[in-house]
Amino acid sequence: MANGIWGVAHIKCSFNNTIITVTDLTGAETIAKSSGGMVVKAARDESSPYTAMQMATQLADILRDKGLEGVHIKVRAPGGNKQRSPGPGAQAAIRAFARAGVRIGRIEDVTPVPHDGTRPKGGRRV
């Protein structure tokens, strides 16, 4: 990744885990961090905002070494017929990127929304 270019940070944040993947604008070169196993070992800490902040600061250091100037952020929740709101680590990760000195371009929500897809789980409610 050359000097002065931008990347795309894909933040997939559920209530069980947070995954941050950084690519260049074409989607080619990838740097990935997952909170489960890579940052914390306890399963109860995987989705916490503190863990997302740690991941984002580690990725910001890697981006600085690679010469990236800033990132566009795409936040994704589980979506589909599951939860449409991102987990607690999404905002913390964005804030940590900004505090670490990474310039932030666009922030998009790319949660998949069904166009009347499959039936959600759970029983019938009358």
From Swiss-Prot:
<dbReference type="Pfam" id="PF00411">
    <property type="entry name" value="Ribosomal_S11"/>
</dbReference>
<comment type="function">
    <text>Located on the platform of the 30S subunit.</text>
</comment>
<dbReference type="GO" id="GO:0003735">
    <property type="term" value="F:structural constituent of ribosome"/>
</dbReference>
<keyword id="KW-0689">Ribosomal protein</keyword>
<dbReference type="GO" id="GO:0005840">
    <property type="term" value="C:ribosome"/>
</dbReference>
<keyword id="KW-0699">rRNA-binding</keyword>
<feature type="region of interest" description="Disordered">
    <location>
        <begin position="107"/>
        <end position="126"/>
    </location>
</feature>
<keyword id="KW-0694">RNA-binding</keyword>
<comment type="subunit">
    <text>Part of the 30S ribosomal subunit.</text>
</comment>
<dbReference type="GO" id="GO:0019843">
    <property type="term" value="F:rRNA binding"/>
</dbReference>
<dbReference type="GO" id="GO:0006412">
    <property type="term" value="P:translation"/>
</dbReference>
<dbReference type="InterPro" id="IPR036967">
    <property type="entry name" value="Ribosomal_uS11_sf"/>
</dbReference>
<dbReference type="GO" id="GO:1990904">
    <property type="term" value="C:ribonucleoprotein complex"/>
</dbReference>
<protein>
    <recommendedName>
        <fullName>Small ribosomal subunit protein uS11</fullName>
    </recommendedName>
</protein>
<dbReference type="InterPro" id="IPR018102">
    <property type="entry name" value="Ribosomal_uS11_CS"/>
</dbReference>
<dbReference type="InterPro" id="IPR001971">
    <property type="entry name" value="Ribosomal_uS11"/>
</dbReference>
<keyword id="KW-0687">Ribonucleoprotein</keyword>
<comment type="similarity">
    <text>Belongs to the universal ribosomal protein uS11 family.</text>
</comment>
<dbReference type="InterPro" id="IPR019961">
    <property type="entry name" value="Ribosomal_uS11_archaeal"/>
</dbReference>
